[in-house]
Amino acid sequence: KVRIGKPISVKDQLEYNDINSFYEYLRKKTYMLANPFVKTPQNILSTQNLKITIPPKKIASQKSTQGFIKEVISLRKKGKRLLESKNYEVFFASAREIPNLLHEIGRLREITFRDIGEGTNKAIDIDKFDKYYHHLFLWDRQSKALVGAYRMGLGKDIYKKYGISGFYIQTLFRLEPELHGMMERTIEMGRAFIIKEYQQKPMPLFLLWKGIVHITLRYPEYKYLMGGVSISNQFSDFSKSLMIEFMKSHYYDPYIAQYIQPKKEFKVKLKDADKDFVFDAAKADMQKFDKVIDEIEPGALRIPVLIKKYVKQNARLVAFNVDPKFNNAVDGLMYIKVSDIPESTVNPVMEEFQAELERKATEENEK
């Protein structure tokens, strides 16, 4: 194979003061282009060798839009709408309140995840956890379409009824007893997606995150958010290894991590020279590191959006695991202390939340 790297901007060139250091940069950068194509020895665990053999099933048919609209109207009446903005509405509901919408969530999950080399390969991505977890979803009332969703597990309720095995993350990681108390005060997040037609628009992910902050205000007994972020199997094992090492170097929490064991750990394989070169080029800057991944990966892949979003919310990384039931995507487990979420994220939502409380109080007094 012959591969040509991306142009090096004048700005990047000017970071080097002498020809020798610039030459060394060019030499290492050139050799780096080959790494995604290096074959992994058979005796080393590689996610490329763990492909699911079951062929993908045909995606389930969509149910009637009228059924979706009926459930949305019902949720509005019950006060389950967290916020609205222009043509968008964000709702938080239990599975029993949205049987038709939940079917659509599962359908769109599978379509969206398959597009990026993930997914269950089933006709619909619905499992036993969906029945007792809550669902945060974004509805476009103009198009009468579901745009995206998060699955949200309220830890206190889950632990009381099912114990630690009631959490989805326990299927991928072993959580030691020292963390059980923390999980009772944790909202578990997962299965996040935005459908392809809306992924380039800035509002959907922003509004879903506003919805998450609304939930933390409505349920103040929860002090943590926790969930997995997926690194698709479309990435080379080399890039996966780089991402994991970069995250561990800058966003790792060793205290919490000691109580979490991955059930199928991804084995990082990196040469020290490659690791040093990438880390020197990126420093601790996520944007620079994202650019490095873009240059290395032949498929124009970037660091998953959710990883970048969580890091901006002061998330900490605690473990990585290969998920064989999800097309061998690598799941990074991260958590956020609610008190650590930046004020720039919380304050606008706090104002909306306070205004909503005042509006409801006024309505009650007028009755």
Task: Specify the residue positions occupied by each region the protein language model found.
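Acyl-donor binding region in acyl/amide transferases
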Residues: T120-A123, D157-R316, N321-D331
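C-terminal/domain-terminus segments
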Residues: E15-K28, M32, L208-W209, R302-K308, ...
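Short, histidine-centered active-site or binding-site loop motifs used for metal coordination
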Residues: K6-I8, S94, R191-K196
